[in-house]
């Protein structure tokens, strides 16, 4: 089923899709869901939300998400906790800016401090590997953490990929809202660059990003769901035409010439094709 067909279904029915590379991963996810829904024991997650958001220097994309989504969702009006958390009787923890590091995200997934959060909201850049890069299938859409300075070469210690999910992670019952380019998957052809009906090829084939797959099928019990972007994420997901957070209103058109999530080209020599950061 092409991603484009699913985009159309999403408008009316908000459909999801489940896909893994092996039968074992399907089995683990199915068992996790059945166990979560049928057990008489207390649910494995705590009544807690975590917001994880970066804000790199000289980077409009992450700073916009911080100002218009992460901070209002964390602090509400006047510095008070947002009412949505109070109404839901949730405790809220934040990893914002300098605290949004690779190691802190690993600890969130381990449930080290207060147990596994029921909801994780992350807003960051997503790693983009170019066509032909052998790392693309495993690392596309990896979470770019605050460990990266916002400019210069990016290294493995700066991002959080599928291979960084701890073996002792406690993900069972978690839902992850994952705002990052390629967080959910990658199309074969660029969804936005189709000049003269000649789309630019960006991958050998369409594929789902590995990080959500690993979280959903973790041997210790998988996450219940991951909500993420296929292809690039844009500030039009949360910003209206007047430059303010859009709330539930959807702007009538996309204007690629302004207000898009910036992309940052990485510098530094490497014997392999260079990955880039996408907003």
List each model region and its residues.
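Structured catalytic cores of large enzymes
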Residues: 1-119, 125-135, 139
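Active-site-proximal C-terminal subdomain of hydrolase catalytic domains
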Residues: 52-59, 68, 179-279
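Short, glycine/acidic-rich beta->alpha junctions
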Residues: 96-104, 112, 157-160, 203-210
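The substrate-binding groove and active-site-proximal loops of carbohydrate-active enzymes
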Residues: 147-155, 197-204
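Extracellular/periplasmic catalytic domains that process cell-envelope and extracellular macromolecules
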Residues: 43-45, 112-115, 168-172, 218-221
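Alpha-helical scaffolding within the catalytic cores
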Residues: 33-35, 157-167, 208-214
